Each structure stands twice: as C-alpha cells, then as structure tokens.
C-alpha cells in the first residue's frame, strides 16, 4: 500500500513542482515586461535620471547637469520633457531650495535664448549647446548678483566654467540619451559613444551623493557595480576606461572621492583581465583592485568599508541576469557577442540578397523558357501552313473572279490544291519550265494558267524575303533565349555562393584548433565551408595582434595539415585594440602563368585588323584570345576588337565559353547585312590542374612546346559572323609545368615567304628557340616571319605566348606534429 502511495505521490509532486516553476516563470516575464514598459515606453527612466541629475553637482556649487539634460530631452523625447523638468526641480529641492531656484532661473533663460536662436537658425541641434551655454552663464550671473549684490572675478570664472561644462554635457547627452529610447539601437557603439554613455551614468551616480549606510556610500557601490559589469562584458580596456571616467566625475563631485578614479580604473583593469574566469574571476579582480588601492589611499582605516562596498557590488553583479550582460555586450565592439551579432546581421543580409538574386534568376529562366518555347513552336510549324498562306494569296488575285471557281475549289478541292502546290514547288525549284507534263496538265485544268504562273513567280520572291526575315527573327529569339538562360545560370550560381553554408566538419575543426593552439596560436573560432581538393574554404576568428600570423604561420600549417597549398584570401582587421580579426583561407592556384605578345599592323601602320586579350577568369582560370577581322585597316580592327570586347565581358560574367562564342557569332551575324566576319582563337587554362580548352573559330593552329617537342592544336569551325548557327568544337589538352602555349594569327602562320608546309616550318623554328621567356619567343617568331619577307609586313601579325609553371608559395609549409594530424580524415 505504501509503494502504491509513493508511486502516486511522486508524479503528483513532480507535476506540482512543474506548475509552480511555470507560474514563477510567467510571473517573472510579466513583471519584466511591465517594468520595461514603465521605464522605457512610458518614460519613467527619464524621471529617475532627471531626479538624480537635479541632485548632482560638482566643485561644491556648480550645477552643469540639469539644463543640458532638459535641452537634450526637448530634442530627443519632447513628449517626456515636462516630466523630466519636474523631476529635475524635485531632485534639486532635496539638496537645497537655492539649487532649485538656480535651475529654475536657468530654465527661464533657456526659453528666452531659444526664441532668439529660432530667429537666427533653423538647425536646433547645432543651436542647442550654444543656447545652453548662454542660458547657464546668464542664470549664474543673475543669481549671484541677486544674492550678493556684487560680481567678483571668481564669480566670472565660475560662471564661465559652469556654462562651458553645460555646453560639453549637452553634446554628450545628445549622444548618450538616445540609447534609452524605444527605437532599436544601432548594431554597435563606438568607443566615444561608450564614453559619453559612461559620463551620463557617472553624472547620474553623482546624484546619489549623501546616501549612505554605516559609512558605505551608495555612489561607490553602484560605481563599482558599473565598472565590474563593463569590465566583464568588454574586457580590460573597456573596464579601465569606464573606471577612469566614472572615478573622474565622482572625484569632481567630492574632492574626497578623487582616489576613486585610481581605485575604479585599477579594479576595472583587473576585472577585465580575469574575465576568462567568468563572473567569479571578474569579481575577484574588483575586490583585489579595490583593496590594494584602498590600502594606499586611506590606509587600514577604511579598509573594511571598502571591502563591504565591493562585496555588495559583487552581489549585485552576481544577481544580474546573464541575458542582460549578453544584450549589452552585443553593442560593445570586440566582444564575442558583438561578433556573433555582426555575423547574424551579415547572414540576414546574405539571405535577403540571395533571395532577391534567386527571384531574378527565376525571372530570367522563365523569360528564357518563354522565348525558347516560342522559338520551338515556330520551328514546329508545318510547311502546310506556309503553303496554305501562299496559295491563298495566289487565289485571291486569280480564282476569286474566275467562272470555274466553284468547280475547282468546291467540287474538286483536293485535286486543285495538290496541282497548284506542285506547280508552286516546281517553280520554286526552277524546274517547272522543263516539266512539260505538269505544265500541260495545269494549262488544261486551269483556264487562267498563264496568270497563275506569273502570280506564283512574283509571289515566290516576296515569300523568300518573308522567310529570310522570319529566320532572322527566330535567330534573334534563340539568341535572347540562350542569353537569358546563361544569365539565369550565372545568377543561380551566384545565389548558391551567397547562401553557402558551412559544412559539418567538427572533427577537422577540432584537429585544426588543437594543432594551432599547440603551436602557441590562440584561435577564437573556426568555420570550415569546404574541404574539396582545390576549393578549400576555411574562415577563422583570431585575436588581432598585427604581426601577420595568418600569412606566416597559420596558412603554412594548414598547408601541411590539408596537404595542399593554402593562402590568405581575405583578412579583416579589428579597428579596436584587443579585438578580433576575421581571416578567410583558401586553396592557392597550383599553377601560374607568364605571358608575352608581339603585334604588328600591315605595312607598319598604326591600325591592325588583329586584336588580342589576356585575362584572368575568377580565381582559377586564365584566358588568352586572338581575333582576326576580315581584311585590314579600320573596318577589320573594328570587327576583331568588337569580338574581343564582347568575349571579355561575357566570359567575365561567368557564362560558359561555348555559349559566349555562339552569342558573339549571333550578334555579329545579325547586326549587319554586310559580308564581314572575324576569326577567334580562344584558350582557357585551368590553373588548378593545368587542363586547357581550345575553341578555334576559323583560326590558325596553336602550338604547345614541351621541351624539344612541339604539338599542333587545331579545330575546324567557320569564322564568326558567316552563318547564324553553328556548333563550336572544343579541343582539350593537358598541359604540364614548363609548357609554352603559342597562339598566332594567319599573318604569322601563313606569313613566311616561299614556304609550302607552314606547319613544319613553324615547328622547326620553335624547336630551335633557345629561350623560355614568353616575350622573347613572341618577338623572335615575328622577327623570323618578317625576315622571310625581306622586312616587309604584308599582313596584320599577332602572336601570343603563355608559359605555365608551378606556383611556389611565398611561405613554405610548417610541419605539424603527427598527433594532431589525421590526414585521411582531414582530406
């Protein structure tokens, strides 16, 4: 029976505990929500700040806080300014009625000077500090004169000091008060903005002067709590800065508290240095720092008071929810939370951008399909529809007025249609005149045969023109469809690149972190996006030191771990001291190229019909191209140069090279009716594996020189611009380090005089070359060809030479101990 009761009571007790915990959580959230609404949405926070700033003063009699706060409130939260001024006056009354009267006088002067400033300028933000300055100076001068009846030099100086401080505090409050507004704070705060915010906090703490319990000052406790919180959030630099600023303001309020600047600064420094020990470490730093400075400042007399004040501040710090410290840390530069916030923001921007690019890609793809469908539908139209249209035009001018119309087209429709169709086809093929049987049959059948024959001949000319125009339009649609599809694919690839997410390589990340930390390098974070051979992509977050560890140490170590040359692709240094750098590592190119070119116009002129280009395509491809325009001179130069420019733009956009050449061909063939064309010789080298694609359109052969061997590369394609549609033949070759790729126009290849076999002559000259320098080879080949012509340049000449070599990195790989290296798993 007891067991049964325990079994029943156990679950019931658990359910009751869960209900109690749920009720407590709901209550906590409700209270937090109401407090947040009360302080920030309803503006009670400004009442609290105004009350404490009304109590705040420095140098025993200077009141520079109240009027700047009210002026800033008028600009930032005008709807809460009335409550703020009441709070300021109430706070001043708790000190003395004299303070309250001075602030009231300053407010009245402020309204007067504001009206004057409104007539001078419309920029209220720029005018506010000046208005506050004159208002505070006038109020102090009038108050002192009314009180004493005289105005001494000391009073002048104090009035100017008070007005100057009010001027500066107005600028500071304009920067710091917006942090308390309901609107979302920007992603990060500058160091200057943090200092302005701390001056505001310290000014508010000054208003707590005089509140004490058994010798423990309220402003001391809260000041240490603020310094401890910021040292834990932002580290030693932020903690020390906050300590100096807070201590300085408290010291100005009470000369006896001047040592607090040293105490708070040193405590903030120690707390920040010990932040790695979590809250306990930062708390120990505060206690040790405050005790040490207290021993030097006050001796053993106030040691226990200082200890109690620090312990209370530590208790408040330990009771502060971690969610609050994390939320504040998001706005402090250099913190991990700020870095994560930045990454999250960048990820959101990336997703939005990728979504937009995807939408554009889908639009272009839909347009491409629409054009392609229309183009295919046009191609699938049967010849019968064309024949029907043609015959309808013939009958309209002949059979409509014929007396045999009913017999031919009603009673014998099929026979009439077939006979006229046969006559049309025979006439189109130029065989009707010789086909006596068909001609006789048609003349016997049709009473207007002569008229119909003439109409068919005339209409055929118009019909052919119509078909030619229709073909042009169809080719244009096909070109647009292919281009839109190419653009869609490029944008889809770009979207995938934007949306690139890190792959799950937890084991490899741990191995890399352990290896680097064993070497003495601190790594904050590692993200591996890809370990694909030749496409490695790793990003790291490391402390910024400015000594180039990324390039000199980390990249060489990764090269040994991954068995592939790694280099720094991008590095973003932290603009703040003790911040973090974001470094991207990637595969380096396995090969590099060096180039040379020689170029000459016919007859030594300035304008050549040849054009050439050498360019990098992305990170791992290199392209060289030569175009030879038909003939010589300006027109040929225009054609070849236009071909090269179009090729560069299209290839750089990422569109496939075959589509690029087809597009250029369609553009050049459609844009004019002149019989012009240009050749194109294109080579694309993959710098990762040294493979090479040759796309030759009406061009001369290319040559690969490998040691003493010379290999010819050629393909048979018509020149660009002759026909509207053709298939590009692609020739692939595998290059090796040390190979020389030699491309040339027909002016070089066919230039040698009295040479029957140009291939053998060119190979013999290449084998005889004693240099491997690309520029020297280009110059020597051109010189040899010109020499065979007795120094005459009888055609445009262009030769391009590309040498491929292994890419040797700047820094050699650093061996990693085998205990940290599991290359099978890494790769």
From Swiss-Prot:
**What is a single molecular function from GO for this protein?**
phosphatase activity
What spans does the record annotate as topological domain Cytoplasmic, numbered to this chain? 341-827
Q: Where is the PPM-type phosphatase domain?
A: 594-804
Question: Subcellular location, in the record's words?
Answer: Cell membrane
Its GO biological process annotations read: sporulation resulting in formation of a cellular spore
Might you give the EC number(s) for this enzyme? Answer: 3.1.3.16
Mind listing the UniProt keywords for this protein, alphabetically? Answer: Cell membrane, Hydrolase, Membrane, Protein phosphatase, Sporulation, Transmembrane, Transmembrane helix
Transmembrane feature ranges = 49-69, 71-91, 116-136, 142-162, 175-195, 206-226, 247-267, 269-289, 299-319, 320-340
The family database entries (SMART domains) matched by this protein are listed as: PP2C_SIG, PP2Cc
| Known catalytic reactions | O-phospho-L-seryl-[protein] + H2O = L-seryl-[protein] + phosphate; O-phospho-L-threonyl-[protein] + H2O = L-threonyl-[protein] + phosphate
In terms of superkingdom, the source organism counts as Bacteria
Family annotation (Pfam families): SpoIIE (PF07228), SpoIIE_N (PF19732)
Q: What is this protein called?
A: Stage II sporulation protein E
What is the organism field in this record? Bacillus subtilis (strain 168)
